[in-house]
Amino acid sequence: MTQLRFHAKRLFNGQQFVDDQVLTIIDGVISDIDQNTDDVDVKSTGLVVPGYIDLQVNGGGGALFNDAPSVDKLKTIMSAHAKFGTTAMMPTLITDKVEVMAQAADAMAQAIAERVPGIVGIHFEGPHLSLAKKGTHCAELIRPISDDEWQVLSRKDIGQVIVTLAPETVSTADITRMVKLGIKVCLGHTNADFETAQKAVDAGATGFTHLFNAMSPLNGREPGVVGCALLNDNTQSGLIVDGHHVDYASCQLAIKTKPAGGIFLVTDAMPPVGTDMKEFPLYDRTVYVENGKLTSTTGELAGSSLDMATAVKNTHLKLKIPLEEALRMASLYPAQYLYANNIPTRGELTIGMQADMVVLNDDFNVLETWIGGEKV
């Protein structure tokens, strides 16, 4: 048994700000909280907040998950994002061959078996997408679902699974089948009309991937997928708040429209995070990094160079969202989405929760990241 007494001079526990809290952490889990500051192992003078949870991470630290997926690559990506406060992530495989999907699943199974800190499951973004809204995904690899994909998706050793799909390319029966397997189904890269999207939600889809991006827009006569996302209070949407993917006013509109918890922050991060890379290969093209914006040679946005710390700062400072709500959008709300049918173990710093913590300075930059009571 390992025990640590951690003194937070100021703590945001997921619900409110409190001062002089001492967290007793046993084997990585918060077992008690008191105010006896005489007997502590660690003193923190910054603001201690719940660790950030990113449900859409393609890469980081110079590595792209799609490029020869392995557990070492997962560790590289996780390490890069941990520096910016991410304590749990869903490594994301974009549209690729089924053989690469299987390799990614093998890497995830190994990471789960080895208890690699911060790796909680896998997000398959594609390949069952709309060609009309493919973005930077490879058109030649977009395809209907087959038995080969079902073999990968049905595995029980790869942690939580998220699948992003276009509902016009996948039947409602297949969506329901995924949900029964415990898969979280998100709608994205879709040109579906409102009716088709709504049928997918009725069949069990509960999320929308990078809201506003690569989906049919809202207009007066056709609400589209965006309208479906905003109208259904029982769904949650990921939002990229980097100033490139979505106008800040549109971000504000979505947050005001959805009930509390309806929007969570994601990065859609690519290899440049944590590096000074200016370009990198993706499929058969090159992606260029300029002023934080990633653009492929064919002109599309190609993911982001965003980290979760910057996403939180942008949400608070650019969108004028209260700090406590911006922090929930990076921790509590993605945890609620991920663990909707189970007892959550992340997202708050309360008794019984995993001790995933981030220490911030006055500018909301990350000073320390702790995963399971261990500094990383």
Question: Where are the model-predicted features located?
Answer:
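His/Asp/Glu-enriched, well-ordered alpha-helical/loop segment
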Residues: C228-S237, I255-T267, V273-L360
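Alpha-helical scaffold segments that flank or form the walls of functional sites
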Residues: L47-V48, L55, N66-G118, L141-R155, ...
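Active-site core of metal-dependent hydrolases
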Residues: S154-T275
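Conserved, mostly hydrophobic/aromatic
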Residues: F124, M178, F208, T315, ...
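Active-site gating loops and adjacent loop-to-helix segments of metal-dependent hydrolytic enzymes
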Residues: N58, S79-M90, L131-K156, K199-L211, ...
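Divalent metal-dependent hydrolysis catalytic cores, especially in the metallo-beta-lactamase
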Residues: N58-G60, K75-A104, P117-S130, D157-E168, ...
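N-terminal metal-binding scaffold of metallo-dependent hydrolase/deaminase domains
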Residues: M1-T37, W370, E374-K375
